[in-house]
Amino acid sequence: MNSATTMSASVLNYQILKFFPPQKNGFLKSPLIRGKICRFCVSASSNELNKQVIEDPKEETQEKSDGVIVNSTEEEEERSGENSTSTGPSTVLDNKELKKAVLKTASTFAPRASTATKNPAKPGTVLYTVFEVQAYASMLIGGALSFNLIFPSTEPDIWRLMGMWSIWMFTIPSLRARDCSKDEKEALNYLFLLVPLLNVAIPFFLKSFAVVWSADTVAFLGMYAWKLGWLQKER
């Protein structure tokens, strides 16, 4: 009897297993586990989305910062351009101020008329010619004295000293006394201030009257060529 029941039970179990085979991954295929796995996948995907959303603003901020940097560089270039354009008027103002200072200094120390009268030494008059002859004659005589050709001496004396200063004492004042053009007057004003500086500075390096007179002559010709535009006219 027992053997019959055991055989019937085994046959029943075999039929049950035949119709319902055991699932190897039954634990993973249970609805509870499936729900947890789905939740885990959803949470993982949502974290990735959050990371992407967080990373995108960083890229946008970088792009914005790059744009700010570009804009700042453009602003700096514009400012530098404005500064470069603003240097032009400043140099013009500096030149005007320099001319005013030179004119004021020269008019203060150079000989001038005591009263406000018209200059009679106009071009074509006898007085105009006298001033010109006096100016260039004093320059030539001063050169001869500086080179020790007139009143020669072996030692420095008053004649050679006067020859060294002849351009500043006689030539420039005689030319300024004429009714000359504005450019020539400006050149003479510059020379009236430049020649004393040369006469004082050169003897510290070369104690020679001839060298000082030669430097004054070169400065005289160079200033006239610059202010009157001799080189430009030749070109």
Swiss-Prot record:
<dbReference type="GO" id="GO:0050665">
    <property type="term" value="P:hydrogen peroxide biosynthetic process"/>
</dbReference>
<feature type="region of interest" description="Disordered">
    <location>
        <begin position="53"/>
        <end position="92"/>
    </location>
</feature>
<keyword id="KW-1133">Transmembrane helix</keyword>
<protein>
    <recommendedName>
        <fullName>Protein RESISTANCE TO PHYTOPHTHORA 1, chloroplastic</fullName>
    </recommendedName>
</protein>
<keyword id="KW-0611">Plant defense</keyword>
<keyword id="KW-0472">Membrane</keyword>
<feature type="compositionally biased region" description="Basic and acidic residues">
    <location>
        <begin position="53"/>
        <end position="66"/>
    </location>
</feature>
<keyword id="KW-0812">Transmembrane</keyword>
<feature type="transmembrane region" description="Helical">
    <location>
        <begin position="158"/>
        <end position="178"/>
    </location>
</feature>
<dbReference type="GO" id="GO:0009507">
    <property type="term" value="C:chloroplast"/>
</dbReference>
<feature type="transmembrane region" description="Helical">
    <location>
        <begin position="188"/>
        <end position="208"/>
    </location>
</feature>
<keyword id="KW-0934">Plastid</keyword>
<feature type="transit peptide" description="Chloroplast">
    <location>
        <begin position="1"/>
        <end position="43"/>
    </location>
</feature>
<feature type="transmembrane region" description="Helical">
    <location>
        <begin position="211"/>
        <end position="231"/>
    </location>
</feature>
<dbReference type="GO" id="GO:1902290">
    <property type="term" value="P:positive regulation of defense response to oomycetes"/>
</dbReference>
<keyword id="KW-0150">Chloroplast</keyword>
<keyword id="KW-0809">Transit peptide</keyword>
<dbReference type="GO" id="GO:0006952">
    <property type="term" value="P:defense response"/>
</dbReference>
<dbReference type="InterPro" id="IPR044966">
    <property type="entry name" value="RPH1"/>
</dbReference>
<comment type="function">
    <text>Plays a positive role in the immune response to the oomycetes P.infestans, including induced oxidative burst and enhanced expression of defense-related genes.</text>
</comment>
<dbReference type="GO" id="GO:0016020">
    <property type="term" value="C:membrane"/>
</dbReference>
<feature type="transmembrane region" description="Helical">
    <location>
        <begin position="131"/>
        <end position="151"/>
    </location>
</feature>
